[in-house]
Structure formats: structure tokens, C-alpha cells
């Protein structure tokens, strides 16, 4: 258990570290931006599809005080970056800090109102839209933060008093029911994770506890028609790292049993079917679905290890895109490489999430591990029916982040639509919001929305469409 004494020792050890050491996630492309900007009537090269009416909003860490002591990329103060589009125009770009108490204590803007779960209330990992509301999310601690349409106002939310425990940075919408599913964990509770379901109205209807060991870090999950998939893999809470001063105390743990849990969607912990898998780590899944023979397929980005070689950020060897077949009868998982190219941030056409599907897209990673995780690499597209891979390369010095798929229409065929994401230009310290044709990935962008400042690499973004008239 993390006691006040442990926190005091951790703070002391951190204070003894070198405050001037270079930190890959506080310098260069990751250097925090200082100014909150509002830029209207953005310049555009190409044509924004007229059907796009809404906002693209991404969030990531942007430390208000860039102190390398004990710092990890995953714990920086949250900042949202959004672009609003309507009628073929880019109306505005805004970036705003998420108004946490931690930010206020560091000298930043006043904290937002609303309930807190703990003293650490930084939110920096995902932005979603659900039940007509916009939420910024983080895992393992804080409640969600609700944002207004213009990103100008923030309020912490326990979803009307219905969220009793932690939430996730990676809930998934079931397109057939309209509910959000998440697997959540809490750094203060090392023996339990939870399956949380948020209904169509934005209220929690289920928080089902599942016993685990060692406090695993479970960033993502998957669903099928039958199951919720729990990725219980060997990155776990490390008291030694915390006592040593780490702000993100999770490390590779070879003693932790690697397994995938199949939890029936309305089942209890007693119903989980645990299936062993060779040790690996997974941040993100592409999709999962049930097979007629009773097995479950899940496609994902796999790593050989994670957080085994240094405390600053992701540092494991990417194994590319893998397909795992989870066999509840044998209680085993078979692994198959779909593409060994290093990659991350897989996204499907999310109208088909939890169902058999054909298309997925991902962000390439450098062929050699980069100290700051990122580098020149393409956006990949996969046709899983034919095995064909396509790619879009933005050119030297252009660093893309996660790209999200947006269907052309609600009833469009799978994969018929656009990809959207931020691309950093290292030379000019500017950013483009790029819009690509998902079915012709190698073609020039349909539109580049020019943002005259660098948006630091972040985590997750989403297209948040305006409500239909």
C-alpha cells in the first residue's frame, strides 16, 4: 500500500536527483508549449470534405514545469488541442490546459470545479464524446473532466454520482448498444481491476471487480459480442520504483503471469476464463471478435517488453501488429505476426468494433528504437481480407501521431471515409491537421489544415461530430 511515508520518501529521493539532466520527453519535439492560443480562420491546402462538421480534439502531456526529476512522459499536465471544422472551413484552433489542482499548485491556471478521487488529478490521455458530452480521460486515478464545445471550460465529473471507482483512458463504444465498456485499475488497489459499463445516457450501470495480482497496468481492453477482454500482462506496480522517486511507478515484471481474461459481458469474476500467453506487453488493440469455433480473435500492437530499460517513457521493442487467437477451451493464446513493421495506435472503423472486420490503420514507429519513442515513419493501412498493406509517408522531418478513421456517412461501407491526425513539421515548428482518403492512402492529402505552432506529440484524439440538425 502507498502510505504517506512512502510518498514522503519518494519525494525526498526525487529531490536528490539531477534537476538539469537532459530528458528526451521534455526537450526537442516533446518540449512543452507555454502559450494557450486561439487561432481563427486557419489556412488550408486542398479541400476539407464538406461532410465534416465538428471538432478534432487530441490530448497529451504538457508539463507546466518541466522538471526531469522522476518525470515520465505519461504523467505531464494535460493539454487539449482542437480544430473546429464546418462548411469546408477550419474555423479555429485552440489549445488549453486541463485545469487540475496539480496544475494550479504548479503555478498554472485556477483548478476546475468538480469531485476528485485523489490528490493527483492530472488528466492527459484521451478525449471522447458520449451522451452528447465531451470528456477528457486518464486511467488509474482521476475522474473524467467534462469540456465545453469551445474547450474554454472544464469540470471534473463522476458521471452524476454513478462512477464510484477509477475510470479508463480507453473505453470502447459498442456500436450495437451505444454503451461504453472499459477495464479500469487504480494505483492504490493492486489486487483488483474493474469492468465498467457506461450506458447511453452517460451513467455507470456496472462496476464489476475482478481479482488480479501485482497491480497490472491495463491501458486498453477489447469487447466482442460475448466477452470483455482483460489484458493482464507483465507491467505492474513497482514499489521500488516509487520509493526511488519515480512519478510513474510501473515496470516490466517477469514474475507476473501473462494472460488474457475472457469475461462474459454480464458475468462476474468467477466466470472469467483466463488464457495464458507468452510474455509481451500491449498498449492498444485494433479490434476483437468471436469466431464460430468458440475462439476469440484480437488484433493488437505487441512489444517484447515495456518499461524494462529506463524510467522516462516507452522503451520496449515493437513486434509490430499481431493477431492473438484466444482459446477458452485450451486456456491458451496463439500469437501470429500480421506485420512486423514497428507501429502503434491502431484504429479500426469503429462502427465495426467488437465484430468481424476488414480494415485497420496505425502509426508507424522508427525501425530502431528512438529515445523519444517517435520519428519519421508512415501511417499504415491494412486490408485484413487480402493481407494488403498501404502507407502514407508525409516526408522527411514530418512526424505523424495517431490517425482516426471517420466514415463518409453513417451507412457507408466499412473503410469508406477519411483518416485525420496531427503531423509535426520539425523544421518549421508548425503542425498540420491532415485529412487522408482512407481508401487511397498513398495519395496526397485531401486537405492540410495549417496550425502555425508545434503541437507536442500527444496520445489519443477523436473526431467529435456536431449533433445532426
Curated annotation (Swiss-Prot):
pH sensitivity of activity: Optimum pH is 8.0.
Cofactor binding note: Binds 1 Fe(2+) ion per subunit.
Chain positions recorded as Fe cation binding sites: 170, 219, 284, 460
UniProt GO molecular function: carotenoid dioxygenase activity; metal ion binding
Signal peptide boundaries: none
Keywords associated with the record: Dioxygenase, Iron, Metal-binding, Oxidoreductase, Plasmid
Biological process per Gene Ontology, one example term: carotene catabolic process
The protein's enzyme class: oxidoreductase
EC number: 1.13.11.82
Highest taxon above the source species: Bacteria
Entries under InterPro entries matching the protein: Carotenoid_Oase
Temperature dependence: Optimum temperature is 45 degrees Celsius.
Catalysed reaction, written as an equation: all-trans-8'-apo-beta-carotenal + O2 = 2,6-dimethyldeca-2,4,6,8-tetraenedial + 13-apo-beta-carotenone
Record bears the keyword Disulfide bond: no
Cofactor(s) recorded in Swiss-Prot or TrEMBL: Fe(2+)
Quaternary structure annotation from Swiss-Prot or TrEMBL: Monomer.
Function, in words: Catalyzes the conversion of 8'-apo-beta-carotenal to 13-apo-beta-carotenone and C12-dialdehyde. Also has weak activity with 4'-apo-beta-carotenal and gamma-carotene.
PANTHER family, per database record: BETA-CAROTENE DIOXYGENASE, CAROTENOID 9,10(9',10')-CLEAVAGE DIOXYGENASE 1
Similarity remark: Belongs to the carotenoid oxygenase family.
Name recorded for this polypeptide: 8'-apo-carotenoid 13,14-cleaving dioxygenase
Organism whose genome encodes this protein: Novosphingobium aromaticivorans (strain ATCC 700278 / DSM 12444 / CCUG 56034 / CIP 105152 / NBRC 16084 / F199)
Amino acid at each position: 500500500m502507498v502510505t504517506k511515508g512512502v510518498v514522503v520518501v519518494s519525494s525526498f529521493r526525487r529531490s536528490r536527483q539531477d534537476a538539469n539532466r537532459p530528458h528526451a520527453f521534455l526537450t526537442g519535439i516533446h518540449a512543452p508549449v507555454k502559450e494557450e492560443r486561439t487561432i481563427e480562420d486557419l489556412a488550408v491546402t486542398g479541400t476539407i470534405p464538406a461532410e465534416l462538421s465538428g471538432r478534432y480534439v487530441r490530448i497529451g502531456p504538457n508539463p507546466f514545469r518541466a522538471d526531469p526529476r522522476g518525470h515520465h512522459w505519461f504523467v505531464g499536465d494535460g493539454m487539449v488541442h482542437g480544430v473546429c471544422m464546418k462548411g469546408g472551413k477550419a474555423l479555429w484552433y485552440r489549445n488549453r490546459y486541463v485545469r487540475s489542482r496539480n496544475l494550479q499548485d504548479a503555478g498554472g491556471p485556477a483548478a476546475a470545479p468538480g469531485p476528485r478521487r485523489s490528490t493527483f488529478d492530472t488528466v492527459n490521455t484521451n478525449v471522447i464524446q458520449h451522451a452528447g458530452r465531451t470528456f477528457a480521460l486518464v486511467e488509474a486515478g482521476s475522474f473524467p473532466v467534462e469540456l465545453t464545445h469551445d474547450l474554454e471550460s472544464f469540470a471534473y465529473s463522476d458521471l452524476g454520482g454513478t462512477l464510484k471507482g477509477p475510470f479508463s483512458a480507453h473505453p470502447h463504444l459498442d456500436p450495437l448498444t451505444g454503451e461504453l465498456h472499459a477495464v479500469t485499475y487504480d494505483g492504490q488497489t493492486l489486487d483488483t481491476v474493474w469492468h465498467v459499463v457506461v450506458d447511453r445516457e452517460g451513467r455507470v450501470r456496472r462496476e464489476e471487480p475482478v481479482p488480479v495480482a501485482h497491480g497490472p497496468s491495463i491501458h486498453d481492453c477489447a469487447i466482442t459480442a460475448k466477452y470483455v477482454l482483460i489484458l493482464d500482462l507483465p507491467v505492474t506496480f513497482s514499489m521500488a520504483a516509487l520509493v526511488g522517486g519515480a512519478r510513474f511507478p510501473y515496470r516490466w515484471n517477469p514474475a507476473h503471469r501473462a494472460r488474457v481474461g475472457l469475461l462474459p459481458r454480464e458475468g462476474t469474476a468467477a466466470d472469467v476464463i483466463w488464457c495464458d500467453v507468452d510474455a509481451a506487453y500491449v498498449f492498444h488493440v485494433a479490434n476483437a471478435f468471436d469466431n464460430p469455433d468458440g475462439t476469440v480473435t484480437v488484433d493488437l500492437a505487441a512489444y517484447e517488453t515495456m518499461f524494462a530499460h529506463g524510467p522516462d517513457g516507452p522503451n520496449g521493442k515493437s513486434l509490430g501488429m499481431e493477431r492473438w487467437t484466444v482459446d477458452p477451451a485450451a486456456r491458451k493464446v496463439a500469437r501470429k505476426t500480421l506485420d512486423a513493421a514497428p507501429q502503434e495506435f491502431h484504429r479500426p472503423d469503429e462502427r465495426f468494433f467488437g465484430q468481424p472486420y476488414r480494415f485497420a490503420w496505425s502509426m508507424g514507429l522508427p525501425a530502431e528504437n528512438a529515445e523519444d519513442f517517435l520519428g519519421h515513419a508512415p501511417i499504415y493501412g491494412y486490408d485484413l481480407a487480402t493481407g494488403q498493406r498501404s502507407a502514407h509517408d508525409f516526408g522527411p522531418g514530418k512526424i505523424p501521431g495517431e490517425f482516426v478513421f471517420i466514415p463518409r456517412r453513417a451507412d457507408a461501407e466499412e473503410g469508406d471515409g477519411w483518416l485525420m491526425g496531427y503531423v509535426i513539421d520539425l523544421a518549421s515548428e508548425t503542425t498540420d491537421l491532415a485529412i487522408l482518403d482512407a481508401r487511397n492512402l498513398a495519395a496526397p492529402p485531401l486537405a492540410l489544415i495549417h496550425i502555425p505552432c508545434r503541437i507536442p506529440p500527444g496520445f489519443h484524439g477523436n473526431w467529435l461530430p456536431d449533433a445532426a440538425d
